[in-house]
From Swiss-Prot:
It comes from Homo sapiens (Human). Pfam families: C1-set, MHC_I_3. One of its GO terms (biological process) is antigen processing and presentation, endogenous lipid antigen via MHC class Ib. This is T-cell surface glycoprotein CD1e, membrane-associated. Expressed on cortical thymocytes, dendritic cells, Langerhans cells, on certain T-cell leukemias, and in various other tissues. CDD domains: IgC1_CD1. One of its GO terms (molecular function) is endogenous lipid antigen binding. The chain crosses the membrane at residues 305-325.
Amino acid sequence: MLLLFLLFEGLCCPGENTAAPQALQSYHLAAEEQLSFRMLQTSSFANHSWAHSEGSGWLGDLQTHGWDTVLGTIRFLKPWSHGNFSKQELKNLQSLFQLYFHSFIQIVQASAGQFQLEYPFEIQILAGCRMNAPQIFLNMAYQGSDFLSFQGISWEPSPGAGIRAQNICKVLNRYLDIKEILQSLLGHTCPRFLAGLMEAGESELKRKVKPEAWLSCGPSPGPGRLQLVCHVSGFYPKPVWVMWMRGEQEQRGTQRGDVLPNADETWYLRATLDVAAGEAAGLSCRVKHSSLGGHDLIIHWGGYSIFLILICLTVIVTLVILVVVDSRLKKQSSNKNILSPHTPSPVFLMGANTQDTKNSRHQFCLAQVSWIKNRVLKKWKTRLNQLW
């Protein structure tokens, strides 16, 4: 524990540059949610001799840091992920986490029998701080369920976690040095690091990307019923409001899925509504997002059918053109295939050769037209399937 305190002395008391940047006093978040910095740890224990831990750091919903389990080093995922910390401060922080991950696995494996932790099991820890808020947070989950938390001055078992969580909290509450370390790390170092990140990444945090939305039919929930699906994608920041509407009336049956990340660091969400087939008319999907400047995005159910009609008309026109071209080629070929009934002459022989050449050319054209038709049909069929 002495080593932890020495590391923290350098981390929490670096001398100069300990105040949060003044420029942040006027900083306003693009999202409605209060911004936080969160550290997430996932440790898997297969047996008493094998365990694996992963760690990551998140500024709001944006991952800014990772933990290299092989090298035991912090991975900075953004050019500004260093914040305003000095190299020495980051080195101290990295040394602290190296010691923590190594010690955590040893302590858990040594205590698994005492607290009846049955292999294999998984422990998740979420800890961090919020900007301009005094409270800190640390929550632990065991096998995917809430287990215990650190409330700033004491460890508390989660409701329904049972006697095992109560016993572990009793043991943890005896170690005052652990409480002091957490209070310093989460109550002092974390807010200062969060302030530096917000200043360094201000331009990216203020980025706004407008959502795109489209409608489709999902799997039928039953005879005579429809599942209407509203897809919203490509928006940033994450907070978004999506609802099926009838006029100005919200449809309470709207089911929202999870907000999922896209590869370009934007977000995707779908909202569904099960209705009787005859009640779909007049419904619309409304999207509210900070990038829209107060103007809601509204898509009416059935509006997309006009688009489908245009596609169908385009397909029909294309097929008609192909049929006309095919017909003309056949007509030209038949006009030039009239043979003379007289004895063959050199001119006829020459014409025969020409005819063979033209027949070959005609067959090639027919094959090409057939290939074009098949290809076009295949493409349009694929597009239509995607819409449905």
